[in-house]
A protein has these predicted regions:
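N-terminal intrinsically disordered, low-complexity, charge/repeat-rich segments that act as generic
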Residues: 1-23
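Short, conserved turn/kink motifs that form compact alpha/beta structural patches or helix kinks used as
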Residues: 21-144
Length: 144
């Protein structure tokens, strides 16, 4: 457990640009399944399946003097609104459920979610994240 590497991409809506953060020693639990495609319109020789992928990303952090720090990551976590309003986004990261995504590998190539998804596997758009600040301090980030 906790032997995966992921790259998180944060989208800056004001500059239309992405900032990336590499996390090592995180846990990724992936689910893949196929869903029958019902768009064949009577052509039963052409029944395709679409893959449905989901991932749970678990990132441990330390809560020191009100700051959330991840081992090996020289950046500070900020809540999404605070991150969007800060000038220096390169020294911080966040989890935005409407536009951020992650890939299960170290990848410093910055492209949009759609571009990266077209030629890489294991790319997930963040749709939920939970912050477990008062228990075993960690984030659970869900993506599809």
């Amino acid at each position: 457990m906790f032997n995966n590497t992921v790259t998180l991409y944060n989208y800056d809506k004001f500059k239309d640009d992405y900032y990336y953060t590499v996390f090592k020693n995180v846990e990724v639990q992936e689910q893949q399944r196929s869903i029958p495609d019902d768009t064949h319109h009577g052509d039963y020789n052409n029944i395709y399946e679409r893959a449905y992928d989901r991932a749970l990303l678990i990132i441990k952090y330390k809560f020191i003097d009100g700051i959330k720090l991840v081992d090996g990551v020289p950046k500070t976590f900020l809540d999404p609104k605070e991150w969007n309003n800060t000038e220096d986004k390169s020294n911080n990261f966040t989890f935005q459920t409407d536009c951020d995504f992650f890939i299960v590998e170290e990848n410093k190539e910055i492209k949009s979610f759609e571009e990266l998804k077209n030629y890489k596997d294991r790319v997930y758009k963040i749709d939920i994240y939970d912050d477990y600040e008062y228990d075993l301090t960690h984030w659970e980030v869900y993506g599809a």
